[in-house]
Swiss-Prot record:
<dbReference type="GO" id="GO:0070475">
    <property type="term" value="P:rRNA base methylation"/>
</dbReference>
<dbReference type="Pfam" id="PF01795">
    <property type="entry name" value="Methyltransf_5"/>
</dbReference>
<keyword id="KW-0698">rRNA processing</keyword>
<feature type="binding site">
    <location>
        <position position="104"/>
    </location>
    <ligand>
        <name>S-adenosyl-L-methionine</name>
    </ligand>
</feature>
<keyword id="KW-0963">Cytoplasm</keyword>
<comment type="function">
    <text>Specifically methylates the N4 position of cytidine in position 1402 (C1402) of 16S rRNA.</text>
</comment>
<feature type="binding site">
    <location>
        <position position="111"/>
    </location>
    <ligand>
        <name>S-adenosyl-L-methionine</name>
    </ligand>
</feature>
<dbReference type="InterPro" id="IPR023397">
    <property type="entry name" value="SAM-dep_MeTrfase_MraW_recog"/>
</dbReference>
<feature type="binding site">
    <location>
        <position position="83"/>
    </location>
    <ligand>
        <name>S-adenosyl-L-methionine</name>
    </ligand>
</feature>
<feature type="binding site">
    <location>
        <position position="59"/>
    </location>
    <ligand>
        <name>S-adenosyl-L-methionine</name>
    </ligand>
</feature>
<dbReference type="GO" id="GO:0005737">
    <property type="term" value="C:cytoplasm"/>
</dbReference>
<dbReference type="GO" id="GO:0071424">
    <property type="term" value="F:rRNA (cytosine-N4-)-methyltransferase activity"/>
</dbReference>
<keyword id="KW-0489">Methyltransferase</keyword>
<comment type="similarity">
    <text>Belongs to the methyltransferase superfamily. RsmH family.</text>
</comment>
<dbReference type="InterPro" id="IPR029063">
    <property type="entry name" value="SAM-dependent_MTases_sf"/>
</dbReference>
<feature type="binding site">
    <location>
        <begin position="39"/>
        <end position="41"/>
    </location>
    <ligand>
        <name>S-adenosyl-L-methionine</name>
    </ligand>
</feature>
<dbReference type="InterPro" id="IPR002903">
    <property type="entry name" value="RsmH"/>
</dbReference>
Length: 317
């Protein structure tokens, strides 16, 4: 049964066929799409499921929710929450185990391309950066109160920016001029402040790239929420169920890789103890490898170049 989607997709879904083929092992299973976006993966999953199958999708973005609400398919449900609420949402729906969890991380192309969302330095817009603009603190609000140390830590840790301290000092110096210049509220001005500090240029990369990524990750608590949803997914997967995660930068991929490796490895045993490795419980996950976008996909969709898809299967009951 193919789902009805009211809107055409506004961007190319990365690793679409590869992700859905890795995810769906039972046509009558219950599946989770942790990031509905504009519905690319969800539509493909629904097309693969039988009449008894079920798909529950999550998203924080009100525009994604509006798109999802046009899906005329009784097997589909959208939840307007972060995927970090996965465990509670399944408990509320009396769902014990699921057959697969798909996470397509990061910001979607429509979010980047809309200057009003504040994610991009390529066009001037309000300094927002929230996945859900109706909740939480915006980037402008945070920059208006954060200390040099707080900014330095965020830009260094989440952007891997070696000029983090200098950028933080420049931002606080700009804040001191707020009475004369007004508050810092635009992406264009933030990008210019960073460019004035970062004199060395990485080939093919805007000097503001790392700082924008860092502030966005902090505002949306992306890495903390990723840790939460990975643990929840592991606890919910049935035996034979799949965890499929697509990441777009090294910080995300590092967390996913470490999580999957940790839960697919037997615990270390002190040889001085009277315990044999065979007496220990088997690890819950089995690694099924990683996948990169093909040359053809990258040529058609340059955003796919940085995508890494990791797949693991639950082998323990």
């Amino acid at each position: 049964m193919a789902p009805a989607m009211g809107n055409e997709l506004q961007h190319r879904t990365v690793l679409l066929e590869e992700a859905v083929n890795a995810l769906v092992t039972r046509v009558d299973g219950i599946y989770i799409d942790g990031t509905f976006g504009r519905g690319g993966h969800s539509r493909a999953v629904l097309a693969k499921l039988g009449e008894a199958g079920r798909l529950i999708a999550f998203d924080k973005d009100p525009l994604a929710i509006a798109t999802a609400q046009q899906v005329a398919d009784p097997r589909f449900e959208i939840v307007h929450e972060s995927f970090a609420s996965l465990r509670d949402a399944m408990s509320e729906r009396a769902v014990g185990r699921v057959s697969g969890v798909l996470l397509d991380l990061g910001v979607s192309s429509p979010q980047f391309d809309d200057p009003e969302r504040g994610f991009s330095f390529r066009a001037d817009g309000p300094l927002d950066m929230r996945m859900d603009p109706t909740r939480g603190e915006s980037a402008a609000d945070w920059l208006a109160r954060a200390t040099v140390q707080e900014m330095t830590e965020v830009i260094r840790d989440y952007g891997e920016e070696r000029f983090a301290f200098q950028i933080a000092k420049a931002l606080v110096a700009r804040r001191a001029e707020s009475d004369r210049l007004g508050p810092l509220v635009s992406t264009g001005e933030l990008a210019q402040i960073v460019a004035n500090v970062v004199k060395t240029r990485e080939k093919g990369k805007d000097p503001a790239t790392r700082t924008f990524q860092a502030i966005r990750i902090h505002i949306n608590q992306e890495l903390a929420e990723l840790q939460v949803v990975l643990e929840a997914a592991l606890s919910l997967l049935e035996q034979g169920g799949r965890l499929v995660v697509i990441s777009f930068h090294s910080l995300e991929d590092r967390i996913v890789k470490r999580f999957m490796q940790t839960h697919s490895s037997a615990p270390a045993v002190d040889r001085r103890l009277p315990i044999r490795a065979v007496d220990l419980p088997s690890p819950p996950l089995k690694l099924l490898g990683r996948v990169f976008a093909s040359d053809e996909e990258v040529a058609a969709n340059p955003r796919a170049r940085s995508a890494v898809m990791r797949v693991a299967e639950r082998i323990a009951p």
